C-alpha cells in the first residue's frame, strides 16, 4: 500500500483539516480557479434565490484535493442555509440517512462525500427523497409491515466523488447540476498560495509562491501542505520569509521535484521505462512491478501523470511518453 503520509498525496491527511478550514474561501467571489464551474454556479444560485427555491441537486466530481467540500460549503453560504455533512461509507443503514433527512430545514444542503460508496439499501431511500422530497419508511416487521411516506422540506443534495463512473446510472441521473473540477493552472495556484500565506501571516514573494504552485500537481490541498513545510524551512534555515531560493531548497529537501513528483511518481515512470522498455504494460503487471494496488495507481498516481502528458493510457496498456524520458534525461527508443 502507498504510504499514508505521502507529502504530495491529494487525499486529505489528519493535519490538513483544521488548517484547511481556516484557509477555505467562504463565498464564490473568494474562490480562485475553476472559472467555468464558478460561472455556472453563480447563475444557478441566483436563479434559485430569485425563485425562492432550493437549489437543484448537485454532483461535484474530479480528482481529490480540488475543492469539492469547499464548493459545497460555499453553496450553502451563498444560499444562506445550513449544511449537514457526511460520507458514503458512514451511511451504513437506511436509518442513518433517514435521521439526517428528517432533521433538514427548508433549503438546507446535505453534503455526501464519497457518494459512490453508498450501499444499495441507502441509495434506494435516497431516490424518492431527491425526486419527490419524500421518505419511505417501513413500520413493523413480517406480514404486518407497512410503508408510510414522510414529507421532507425541499433540500439540496450535494454529492462529491472522485469516481463519477462508479455511481449507478439511476443515482447519477437524479443530479440536475453535474460539475467537474479540473486540475488548477499555476497562475491560480500561485494566487491560492499567496492567499493562504496571508492567512498564516507568512511573508512570501511572487516567485516563492510560483515555485510552490508549480510543484503542487495542480491541487490546492497539496499547495497548502507544501506551503506549511516551506514555512518550517524558512523559519529554521532562513529569516522566515519565503523567496524562490528558499522554496526551491525546501522542496528539494522534501524530495518534491520541479514537476511535483515524489519518489512514488518516479518509481512508476521508471518502472515503465526500465522494466517494460517504455510500454505498453498492463495495469496488473505495473502494479506488481512497483508493489502497489491497481486502485492506487488508477486513482492516486496516474491522473496527474496522464493529465500532464507523462503517461498515455492505451488499449494495450500504459506507455511512457517522450516527456517522461526527457524528465529523466533519457533518450526514448525509436
From Swiss-Prot:
Gene3D superfamilies in UniProt: 1.10.8.60, P-loop containing nucleotide triphosphate hydrolases, Winged helix-like DNA-binding domain superfamily/Winged helix DNA-binding domain
Q: Which reaction does it catalyse?
A: ATP + H2O = ADP + phosphate + H(+)
Q: What is its EC number?
A: 3.6.4.-
Q: Which UniProt keywords apply?
A: ATP-binding, Cytoplasm, DNA damage, DNA recombination, DNA repair, DNA-binding, Hydrolase, Nucleotide-binding
Q: Which GO terms fall under molecular function for this chain's record?
A: ATP binding; ATP hydrolysis activity; four-way junction DNA binding; four-way junction helicase activity
Small ATPAse domain (RuvB-S): region residues: 185-255
* Pfam families per record: AAA_lid_4 (PF17864), RuvB_C (PF05491), RuvB_N (PF05496)
Residues the entry annotates as binding ATP = 24, 65, 68-70, 131-133, 174, 184, 221
Which residues does the record give as Mg(2+) binding sites?
A: 69
Alphabetical list of CDD domains matching this protein: AAA (cd00009)
What is a single cellular component term in the Gene Ontology annotation?
Holliday junction resolvase complex
Q: Spell out the InterPro entries in the cross-references.
A: AAA+_ATPase (IPR003593), AAA_lid_4 (IPR041445), DNA_helicase_Holl-junc_RuvB (IPR004605), P-loop_NTPase (IPR027417), RuvB-like_N (IPR008824), RuvB_C (IPR008823), WH-like_DNA-bd_sf (IPR036388), WH_DNA-bd_sf (IPR036390)
Residues reported in the UniProt entry to bind DNA:
294, 313, 318
Q: Where is this region: Large ATPase domain (RuvB-L)?
A: 4-184
Q: Where is this region: Head domain (RuvB-H)?
A: 258-334
Q: Tell me how this protein assembles.
A: Homohexamer. Forms an RuvA(8)-RuvB(12)-Holliday junction (HJ) complex. HJ DNA is sandwiched between 2 RuvA tetramers; dsDNA enters through RuvA and exits via RuvB. An RuvB hexamer assembles on each DNA strand where it exits the tetramer. Each RuvB hexamer is contacted by two RuvA subunits (via domain III) on 2 adjacent RuvB subunits; this complex drives branch migration. In the full resolvosome a probable DNA-RuvA(4)-RuvB(12)-RuvC(2) complex forms which resolves the HJ.
Describe the family membership recorded for this protein in Swiss-Prot or TrEMBL: Belongs to the RuvB family.
The record's comment about this protein's domains reads: Has 3 domains, the large (RuvB-L) and small ATPase (RuvB-S) domains and the C-terminal head (RuvB-H) domain. The head domain binds DNA, while the ATPase domains jointly bind ATP, ADP or are empty depending on the state of the subunit in the translocation cycle. During a single DNA translocation step the structure of each domain remains the same, but their relative positions change.
Q: What NCBIfam families has UniProt attached to this entry? A: PRK00080.1, ruvB
Primary role: The RuvA-RuvB-RuvC complex processes Holliday junction (HJ) DNA during genetic recombination and DNA repair, while the RuvA-RuvB complex plays an important role in the rescue of blocked DNA replication forks via replication fork reversal (RFR). RuvA specifically binds to HJ cruciform DNA, conferring on it an open structure. The RuvB hexamer acts as an ATP-dependent pump, pulling dsDNA into and through the RuvAB complex. RuvB forms 2 homohexamers on either side of HJ DNA bound by 1 or 2 RuvA tetramers; 4 subunits per hexamer contact DNA at a time.
Descriptive protein name: Holliday junction branch migration complex subunit RuvB
- Originating organism: Shewanella baltica (strain OS155 / ATCC BAA-1091)
Amino acid at each position: 500500500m502507498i504510504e499514508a503520509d505521502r507529502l504530495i498525496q491529494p487525499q486529505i491527511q489528519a493535519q490538513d483539516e483544521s488548517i484547511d478550514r481556516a484557509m477555505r474561501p467562504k463565498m464564490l467571489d473568494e474562490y480562485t480557479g475553476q472559472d467555468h464551474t464558478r460561472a455556472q454556479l453563480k447563475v444557478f444560485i441566483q436563479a434559485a434565490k430569485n425563485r425562492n427555491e432550493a437549489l437543484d441537486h448537485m454532483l461535484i466530481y474530479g480528482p481529490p484535493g480540488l475543492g469539492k467540500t469547499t464548493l459545497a460549503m460555499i453553496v450553502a453560504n451563498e444560499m444562506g442555509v445550513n449544511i449537514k455533512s457526511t460520507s458514503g461509507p458512514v451511511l451504513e443503514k437506511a436509518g442513518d440517512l433517514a435521521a439526517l433527512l428528517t432533521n433538514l430545514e427548508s433549503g438546507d444542503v446535505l453534503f455526501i462525500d464519497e457518494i459512490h460508496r453508498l450501499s444499495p439499501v441507502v441509495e434506494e431511500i435516497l431516490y424518492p427523497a431527491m425526486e419527490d422530497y419524500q421518505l419511505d419508511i417501513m413500520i413493523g416487521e413480517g406480514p404486518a409491515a407497512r410503508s408510510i411516506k414522510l414529507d421532507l422540506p425541499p433540500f439540496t443534495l450535494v454529492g462529491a466523488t472522485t469516481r463519477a463512473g462508479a455511481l449507478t446510472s439511476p443515482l447519477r441521473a437524479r443530479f440536475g447540476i453535474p460539475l467537474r473540477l479540473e486540475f488548477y493552472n499555476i497562475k491560480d495556484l500561485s494566487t491560492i498560495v499567496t492567499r493562504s500565506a496571508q492567512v498564516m501571516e507568512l511573508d512570501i514573494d511572487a516567485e516563492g509562491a510560483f515555485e510552490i504552485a508549480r510543484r503542487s500537481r495542480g491541487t490546492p490541498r497539496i499547495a497548502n501542505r507544501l506551503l506549511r513545510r516551506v514555512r518550517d524551512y524558512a523559519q529554521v534555515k532562513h529569516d522566515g520569509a519565503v523567496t524562490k531560493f528558499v522554496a526551491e531548497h525546501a522542496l528539494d529537501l522534501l524530495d518534491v521535484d520541479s514537476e511535483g513528483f515524489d519518489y512514488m511518481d518516479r518509481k512508476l515512470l521508471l518502472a515503465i521505462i526500465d522494466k517494460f522498455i517504455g510500454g505498453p504494460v498492463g495495469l496488473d503487471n505495473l502494479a506488481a512491478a512497483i508493489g502497489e494496488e491497481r486502485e492506487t495507481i488508477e486513482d492516486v498516481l496516474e491522473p496527474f501523470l496522464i493529465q500532464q502528458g507523462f503517461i498515455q493510457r492505451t488499449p494495450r496498456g500504459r506507455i511512457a511518453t517522450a516527456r517522461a524520458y526527457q524528465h529523466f534525461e533519457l533518450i526514448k527508443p525509436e
